UniProtKB/Swiss-Prot annotation:
It holds the Pfam family 120_Rick_ant. The keyword tRNA-binding does not apply. Residues 54-69, 1030-1039 have a biased composition (Basic and acidic residues). This is Antigenic heat-stable 120 kDa protein. Coiled coil: none annotated. One of its GO terms (cellular component) is cytoplasm. Residues 31-44, 424-438 have a biased composition (Polar residues). It is found in: Cytoplasm.
Length: 1039
């Protein structure tokens, strides 16, 4: 058991990582907590673990007896351990007991007035330190270096009967502490002290035993009937809420961790508790003590229970402050990510604690902030213990050192820093042999390496001394860069230690008050650049450094969002520059996670993720990798609900573009393979490329991207070594595939044809080949056999594609002439074939010009018939002279009438006539449709709307079929869109009426049904008319 405060050495929280990956979540136990107010702590006993502590012989004997009694006990029926809390009543004068929090502020002289904290120190922490010291003395007796052994023995003896804080706080003594902890007997003693100590403290300061504000079990309540989330509200005695604790059960896929003897233990379930960091609701002190769970997620018996405890002491403003953490040691984490759960080995068993790596680090930083001292999180004890297991992959944590302490250490008159691990009477000697020696060694870098050769703390002291002395920003950046280089080049450090030291340097840079914000950004970016250029660190390990660096930058309170984003973008650049794709994925995923889990506002998190996405999008990676990385960022952002709808849309658009580009490249490659295939003749190639064209048209990408894709495919065909006619045949096939496509809208077909012709015009090939391909495209359009008006628009699209190209003017005109020539040829062919197939007994398609011409013919017939009837003698054979005379008169009359009618016909066809052009007819039609839709919108009730549909869209035959069908389609689209938007974003919802966002779904369905019935009625009527042959009369009467 150790107290995790802000003191280096054994009191600190030692961590080590295992490589097992946490995959799901665990079963909760119940917490014990205590709370106290500022009037309830008259005790002024020692609090700081560095302060002196004396034990009487009677106290030692009593403690040993308690331990023996505990291990000699047998309990026929074991009771489960509970979580608990305790608090000091707001009006009480009694001290507050706590296992997991402090109820008194730590003053500058390291005093505390909290009896629970004092009890934990006296019954658990100090006895454990004494036992370790005894074991170290035994180990020293066998040490070969007798001078060193004697020196260390004196250090321990000088502190004997005290807290041994100086010895345990000296980094140079860690190897002796680690060796002692390898002793199995010592480990058993430490575990027994911990269990017996907790049992004693929990019993002594229990509310059930009459201690006011003492420990009592937490009453968890399920949240929203969910089995994996529980909560409880902790209040002081006045009923004021101190905090709400949330507990999440994590039922995970089984993963294994290793015990000290190498045995693998499977973890099936654990829990996470969201320990509060800041408390500002009510006054008082609070102690939260959470029992460690067994590997299967169940609670141990009370006689085997150990606890993770958070001590919250009343601060200057009366509000609880997180002052200290008590937890079993060595503390390890099942992974290197912030979500990795903490676990311990105790009594030969594995237990999980209700805290993750990320939460633990966050709590330790708050402890540091509230006590104003450094916190050593390097976890050397745990790391060395895992070496016994054969596991050296664990990642030690960084040394976190506040600037004020660093300044105090460098403002002394001494110019040379004397590291704590070096005897006070010996100067620090450079150990340059530890570092790789270039031909010319930078003296500053050598100094940094020298400082690092003793401890990371000395390197930070060295760096901060330089940053305080040097005011030039560029030189400050150089110094930070030198330190980063020294860390990564240190041959004595393994990867884990290098990572920890880089993180420590980054945090020191961000929090250093001697640096301007811009210099901080440049300094951190220099560290990132050093990581990028380092040749010894594997890329996967670099990606972890990047994630940690981003987390430090984003969570800093000393930087503005703009500066944080600059550091983020640099980290992303470095991540994208890593050599293997797995490391790049790990880096970007890690950076994304750091953004989501940061303390930024939701809006700022969204902005940061957009910056990550932009960097990925602008990179030179393959489209496939961009798609993977950007898709992961978008998915994580959406799941975490930190991206606004606009940001999601923007990122999705970028992703769509990448996907489309990837698809385009794949299809171009397919076409290149078809063209190069010697087994394919022209017909086979045409068919294959037609199929590719159809695939493009069928794909869900936007019409614009489809056009770009087919434009690129056309260029590939045009620039292939095929002869001109073969190219023309292939392009003809593409044109036919576009013109005859079943689902594309006419406007999309037209824009796609423009793109294909643009590809022809801009291709690098002979003009004659381009002309042949242009003609082929026009012929393909005609092969589509569309409505003549639509075909005409498509042929015009060919000319527009030529205009939009970068071809020279002379080539553009030549290509337009070729297009017009091909269109004229096809129109002539169609006319000839139409005349050959003409059958007056069958109905013909009628356009306006045909109708007007028929009117003229009918008018001529109506004139000729009366004239002939007025001269019946013309039907008889009469004298030749009379016949000629009368015939001449009749023909003269007919001629006059014909001229009159022709002139009238010409007038109608003139610009001033009343024959409307296609564009004018479309405009009138659109206007009428809009008027009908608008009028429909004024009908408020379902009945009025249904009546409108019947009267105007079914019964009113004065309106053309086209206008009525267009109106129906537009109204159907509006109704469908209303319902889709309403269901997607339900602002108003009642289950009985099914009204969503103000849209009555039942009425909506009725109206859509009426519209579809009207459409079917019109179509059926039209089909009926077409199926009835119309017998046409000749324009002229029989002779």
């Amino acid at each position: 058991m150790s107290k995790d405060s802000d003191n280096p050495g054994y009191e600190s929280g030692y961590e080590s990582d295992t490589e097992e990956k946490k995959q799901e979540q665990a079963v909760p136990a119940q917490p014990i907590s205590s709370t106290a107010n500022k009037d309830g702590n008259p005790d002024t006993s020692e609090f700081d673990p560095l302060a002196n502590k004396e034990y009487t012989e009677e106290q030692k004997q009593k403690l040993e007896q308690e331990q023996k009694e505990y291990f000699s006990q047998t309990t026929p029926q074991e009771l489960e351990a509970d979580d608990g809390f305790s608090f000091t009543p707001a009006s009480s004068t009694q001290s507050t007991p706590s296992i997991s929090s402090l109820s008194g502020g730590i003053s500058s002289d390291s005093q505390t007035s909290d009896p629970i904290t004092k009890a934990v120190r006296e019954t658990i922490i100090q006895p454990q330190k004494d036992e370790i010291a005894e074991q170290i003395l035994k180990d020293l007796a066998a040490l070969a270096d007798r001078d060193l052994a004697e020196q260390k023995r004196k250090e321990i003896e000088e502190e004997k009967d005290k807290t041994l804080s100086a010895f345990f706080g000296n980094p140079a003594n860690r190897e002796f502490i680690d060796k002692a902890l390898e002793n199995p007997e010592l480990k058993k003693k430490l575990e027994s002290i911990e269990i017996a100590g907790y049992k004693n403290v929990l019993s002594t300061y229990s509310a059930a035993n009459g201690y006011q504000g003492g420990f009592k079990p937490v009453q968890w309540e399920n949240q929203i009937s969910a089995s994996d989330l529980r909560a409880t509200v902790v209040r002081n005695d006045a009923g004021d809420e101190l905090c709400t604790l949330n507990e999440t059960t994590v039922k995970t896929k089984p993963f294994t961790v290793a015990k000290q003897d190498g045995t693998q233990v499977q973890i099936n379930s654990y829990r996470e508790i969201d320990f509060p960091i800041k408390l500002d609701k009510a006054d008082g002190s609070m102690h939260l003590s959470m029992v460690a769970l067994k590997a299967d997620g169940t609670k141990p018996s009370k006689d085997k229970a150990v606890y993770f405890t958070a001590h919250y002491e009343e601060g200057p403003n009366g509000k609880p402050q997180l002052k200290e953490i008590s937890s079993p040691k060595p503390l390890k984490f099942a992974g290197d990510g912030p979500d990795a759960v903490a676990y311990i080995e105790h009594g030969g068993e594995i237990y999980t604690l209700a805290v993750t790596r990320g939460k633990y680090k966050e709590m330790m930083r708050e402890v540091e902030l509230n006590q104003g001292q450094s916190v050593d999180l390097s976890q050397t004890i745990a790391e060395d213990l895992t070496k016994v297991q054969g596991r050296s992959q664990e990642t030690p944590q960084p040394i976190i050192t506040p600037n004020q302490e660093l300044k105090s250490s460098i403002e002394t008159p001494t110019t040379t820093q004397v590291p704590p691990i070096t005897p006070a009477n010996q100067p620090l000697q450079p150990e340059t042999s530890q570092m790789p020696q270039p031909q010319q060694v930078n003296p500053n870098l050598l100094n940094a390496a020298t400082a690092l050769s003793t401890s990371m703390q000395d390197l930070l002291n060295y760096v901060n001394a330089g940053l305080t002395k040097e005011k030039d920003g560029n030189k400050q950046i150089d110094l930070i860069n030198e330190a980063a280089t020294a860390i990564l080049n240190n041959e004595k450090s393994d990867i884990a230690e290098k990572q920890a030291n880089i993180i420590a340097l980054t945090e020191n840079t961000v929090n250093n008050n001697d640096l301007t914000p811009d210099t901080k950004v440049a300094g951190v970016n220099a560290v990132l650049e050093t990581i990028k250029n380092d040749q010894n660190t594997p890329d996967l390990e670099k990606s972890k450094m990047l994630e940690a660096t981003v987390a430090i930058a984003l969570n800093s309170e000393n930087l503005e969002p703009k500066q944080k984003q600059q550091m983020l973008e640099k980290a992303v650049d470095v991540g994208l520059s890593l050599k293997d794709d797995a490391s790049r994925v790990t880096a970007i995923d890690g950076i994304t996670d750091a953004v989501i889990k940061s303390n930024l506002s939701t809006e700022d998190k969204g902005t940061m993720l957009i910056a990550v996405g932009d960097k990925v999008n602008a990179s030179e990676l393959s489209n496939a990798e961009k798609q993977k990385l950007l898709g992961s960022v978008l998915k994580k952002g959406v799941e975490a609900q930190v991206l606004s709808p606009e940001q999601q849309q923007l990122m999705q658009q970028n992703l769509d573009k990448i996907t489309a580009e990837q698809t385009k490249n794949a299809q171009i490659t397919e076409v290149q393979g078809i063209l190069a295939n010697p087994a394919f003749n022209t017909i086979a190639k045409t068919e294959a490329i037609q199929n590719v064209t159809t695939k493009v048209l069928d794909s869900p990408i936007k019409a614009e991207i489809k056009g770009e894709t087919l434009e690129s495919i056309t260029k590939v065909v045009a620039e292939s070594p095929l002869n001109g006619q073969d190219k023309a045949d292939i392009v003809k096939g593409m044109g036919e595939a576009i013109a005859s496509h079943k689902t594309m809208a006419p406007t999309e077909k037209i824009s796609t044809i423009e793109s294909v012709e643009k590809g022809v015009a801009e291709s690098i090939t002979d003009l004659e080949d381009k002309k042949l391909m242009t003609k082929g495209l026009v012929e393909g359009i005609y092969e589509g056999k569309a409505n003549p008006e639509i075909t005409s628009e498509k042929t015009k699209a060919v000319s527009r594609g030529i205009d939009k190209s970068t071809a020279i003017p002379e080539d553009k005109q030549a290509l337009k002439d070729a297009a017009n020539e091909a269109a004229l040829d096809r129109e002539t062919q169609n006319l000839t074939e139409g005349l050959k197939r003409q059958n007056l007994g069958e109905p013909k398609p009628r356009d306006d010009i045909y109708n007007k011409a028929q009117d003229v013919a009918d008018a001529l017939k109506n004139v000729i018939t009366p004239v002939l009837d007025a001269h019946p003698e013309k039907r008889e054979v009469s004298e030749e002279e009379e016949v000629v005379k009368k015939t001449s008169s009749i023909l003269n009359d007919i001629s006059k009438l014909a001229i009159e009618k022709v002139n009238n016909f010409r007038a109608m066809l003139s610009p001033d006539g009343n024959l409307k052009t296609l564009e004018e007819k479309k405009a009138e039609s659109t206007k009428k449709v809009d008027e009908l839709v608008k009028e429909f919108g004024t009908k408020s009730s379902t009945e009025e709307q249904q009546s409108f549909i019947k009267a105007n869209l079914i019964d009113d035959k004065t309106l053309s079929k086209e206008i009525r069908l267009q109106t129906i389609n537009k109204l159907l689209q509006e109704q469908a869109q209303k319902r889709a938007e309403a269901i997607e974003n339900p602002n108003v919802k009642t289950e009985d009426v099914r009204v969503v966002s103000g849209v009555n779904i039942k009425d909506n369905i009725k109206i859509m049904g009426a519209l579809m019935n009207a459409r079917d009625s019109i179509i059926q009527s039209e089909n009926l008319n077409k199926s009835t042959p119309i017998k046409r009369e000749s324009s002229f009467p029989p002779r």
